[in-house]
Regions:
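DPxDG-like acidic metal-binding loop motif
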Residues: 69-100
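Short glycine-aspartate micro-motif
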Residues: 13-15, 71-73, 81, 119-123
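Short amphipathic alpha-helical face segments that pack within enzyme cores
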Residues: 48-51, 87, 91, 108
Length: 159
């Protein structure tokens, strides 16, 4: 999956985040959130995704053909939840011709904290007592892929 250009992001896009137990959706255009939805849905992710996508589009007063594409959080996170979101995004790509762009969820979290002349490390809850960690340079470029480790290990490795 490639990245959309800044010019392309002026069009409306549907954001899909199913990487954990929370279903998060938004319609954005030119850097502004037009409508959004976020709710802990746990095991109802597959059943809730399509109706909530329709609701968030209606709240933005848009219809599917008006979208420039789909922005999708490709993780890290729950394998099953990510697959549910990816399947929906790919279905929209195939049925409506919408372009799907994968986003690194950790990089998205790091981005607002970059540009200050220092590295940023993102920690997210994983399974059990483990966490996902990934470090980025001051421009939000990853030093390495996200890894799963214990909190003490992550703190020892943090820049």
């Amino acid at each position: 999956m490639t990245k959309p250009t800044a010019e392309a992001l002026k069009k409306p896009y549907l954001l899909i985040d199913t990487a954990n137990d929370t279903l998060s959706l938004a319609v954005i255009a030119d850097g502004k959130v037009l409508s959004s939805f976020s709710e802990a849905v746990f095991r109802d992710m597959a059943a809730r995704l399509q109706p909530e996508m329709q609701n968030v589009l209606q709240s933005a007063q848009m219809d599917w053909p008006e979208l420039g594409g789909i922005l999708f959080n490709q993780g890290p996170g729950s394998f099953t939840s990510i697959r549910i979101g990816l399947a929906a995004a790919k279905a929209l790509e195939l049925s409506l011709g919408l372009k799907v762009y994968g986003l690194n969820g950790m990089q998205a979290l790091a981005h607002p904290h970059t540009g200050q002349g220092r590295d940023v490390t993102v920690l997210l809850e994983a399974v059990g007592t483990d966490i996902y960690t990934q470090s980025f340079d001051e421009n939000a470029k990853p030093h390495a892929d996200a890894i799963t480790q214990s909190l003490p290990e992550a703190l020892d490795r943090a820049p």
